């Protein structure tokens, strides 16, 4: 191989590597769809499969207050008219789940938000999770530290359409971290305070 051909190959490889490095993971877009959060939401008349292996129960009314399930109230029996006296009071927002099954949100314990090369648009990843019933993710390296903490906070504030995010990072990550590798308890404490 002559010098010019070899130089062109090396230059092209260098350009490809630099182009890949310059891409960045795109944070979630500001929320433009969906409803909520609500101070008090009630899901009415559904059949609950609670995930513990017991048979489905229902119809039930589920009361969600301040983004937490507050109460699951049995309001009758299948095939029998619902006893209106057993129903919880009205919510700010209500969903009629009659004839539908209600499942708890799934939790993905090992999640990544994508990568600039494969899935640079986190909106796609977040909506894919939500569409499959995943309402909480444990990001084990969701992305870099700063990105992960920012997305976690934005999800908590409900400014993006995304599941709840729990950011679990590898000790020693962070663009401003100057403590080197975390290899002992003192360095671990220092990094936790940093993060």
Walk through the language-model features, giving the residues of each.
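Bacterial N-terminal signal peptides that target proteins for export
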Residues: 1-9
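Bacterial N-terminal signal peptides
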Residues: 8-16
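Boundary at the C-terminal end of the N-terminal hydrophobic targeting segment
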Residues: 19-20, 24
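Histidine-rich, glycine-flanked metal-binding segment
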Residues: 25-28, 33-39, 48, 52-103
């Amino acid at each position: 191989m002559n010098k010019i051909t070899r130089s062109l190959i090396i230059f092209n490889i260098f350009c490809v590597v630099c182009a890949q490095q310059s891409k960045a993971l795109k944070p979630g877009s500001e929320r433009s769809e969906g409803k909520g959060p609500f101070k008090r939401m009630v899901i009415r008349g559904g059949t609950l499969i609670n995930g513990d292996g017991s048979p489905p129960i229902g119809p039930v009314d589920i009361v969600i207050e301040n983004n937490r399930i507050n109460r699951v109230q049995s309001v009758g029996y299948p095939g029998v008219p619902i006893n209106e006296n057993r129903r919880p009071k009205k919510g700010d927002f209500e969903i009629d789940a009659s004839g539908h099954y209600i499942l708890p949100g799934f939790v993905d314990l090992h999640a990544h938000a994508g990568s600039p090369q494969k899935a640079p648009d986190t909106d796609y990843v977040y909506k894919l999770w939500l569409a499959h019933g995943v309402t909480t993710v444990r990001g084990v390296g969701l992305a870099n530290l700063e990105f992960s903490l920012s997305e976690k906070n934005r999800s908590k504030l409900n400014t993006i359409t995304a599941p709840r995010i729990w950011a679990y990072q590898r000790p020693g990550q962070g663009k401003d971290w100057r403590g080197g590798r975390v290899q002992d308890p003192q360095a671990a404490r220092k990094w936790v305070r940093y993060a």
